[in-house]
Amino acid sequence: MKNLQCSYCGKKEPLVKRIFGGSHQAFICNECIVEFFNLLEREEENRKQKDVRSHLPKPQEIAQFLDQYVISQEKAKMALSVALYNHYKRISYPKHHHIELEKSNILLLGPSGSGKTLLAKTLARVLNIPFAMSDATALTEAGYVGEDVESILSRLLHAASFDIEKAQKGIVYIDEIDKIAKKGESVQSGRDIGGEGVQQGLLKILEGASVYVPLKGARKNSNTETVLFDTKDVLFICGGAFVGIKEERGEKRSGFLASNPSSPTQRTLRKQLLSYGMIPEFIGRIPLILELEPLNLESLVKILKEPKDSIIAQYQYLFSLDGVKLEFTDEALLAIAQKSLDEELGARGLRHILEEILMPLLFEIPSKEEVTQVSITQGFVLGNSEALILEPRREDG
């Protein structure tokens, strides 16, 4: 057949590489096939974006979800809810003319046990998106023994079951970020491979870049299988205690400080972070800085019993699997919270304390089939008395 003509664009051979024939004398060229394929891809992408938008919870709904699992830190929860909503709204809506919304990575400042990790994990649960956590203390500059920054993305890819599209819209939490502050000039230990070098290495992925990521989490080398990973839509949340940064601003904390980045409060905090050892380029890539307050006694008691998956509920479920009802008196809960407060362990210390006091019972009770109920009292928590163990009444005769 000669002089075939595309039924769609009108081009003839040899202006196009190839023309394919179909039934009813319809013909299509290779260029139109590519164009139609791209059109279908765009329509599918638009459909996915509309689907995301229709299921994207509003900030108040996100905050309500956080309230089910996270006690206290109300202002931080509000700011995080807005940040999460805006981040995924930015992803799901097409660009408007020349306006491109930049992503707002987040820095959480707060003492150990104040809820930084829990907040990050729970945010990912709101949208059921991949979540990966990394410890900054394990990171080293590329070329040195340890984990490089690409290993963070490997974890996210693994959390997404190696679905690259899902992984590229996930959340990464980097804990102990204060531990990669650069060392002082007086330190004569050679190159700062775990401090400023790591901060420099994180800059690219924080801002948004395409990097080759090892599939198995190892460092890249010539024999490592890699995949190209675009981080422009990954939300990065960094957390650190930043021990030693004192309140020098002379005003009450607002809980979230990024609403006005040029405010005296915000400027002072950023200066403190720079003095601490965070480099300007790193701080510049994290627009949203949130301060979490230390948890007080009342908050710790609430954490024990009020969240949807509270620590007390978890232990009660463990005991129920052996047919035993576990109860705590109000005084016992208060004593547990006070212990954690005295030891400055925060919410993280509650599980440690509970595990310690319940260990003898967890060891003995499964072998005592006659036990039906265990009551934990203040005296038992403080080590002054035994737990109240109830057994069914035996009938005489």
UniProtKB/Swiss-Prot annotation:
Residues 1-48 form the ClpX-type ZB domain. Zn(2+) binds at residues 6, 9, 29, 32. Keywords: ATP-binding, Chaperone, Metal-binding, Nucleotide-binding, Zinc. ATP binds at residues 111-118. One of its GO terms (molecular function) is ATP hydrolysis activity. Disulfide bonds: none annotated. Signal peptide: none annotated. PROSITE patterns: CLPX_ZB. InterPro entries: AAA+_ATPase, ATP-dep_Clp_protease_ClpX, ATPase_AAA_core, Clp_ATPase_C, Clp_protease_ATP-bd_su_ClpX, ClpX_bact, P-loop_NTPase, Znf_CppX_C4. It comes from the Bacteria. One of its GO terms (biological process) is proteolysis involved in protein catabolic process. Component of the ClpX-ClpP complex. Forms a hexameric ring that, in the presence of ATP, binds to fourteen ClpP subunits assembled into a disk-like structure with a central cavity, resembling the structure of eukaryotic proteasomes. Belongs to the ClpX chaperone family. ATP-dependent specificity component of the Clp protease. It directs the protease to specific substrates. Can perform chaperone functions in the absence of ClpP. This is ATP-dependent Clp protease ATP-binding subunit ClpX 2. It comes from Wolinella succinogenes (strain ATCC 29543 / DSM 1740 / CCUG 13145 / JCM 31913 / LMG 7466 / NCTC 11488 / FDC 602W) (Vibrio succinogenes). The gene is clpX2.
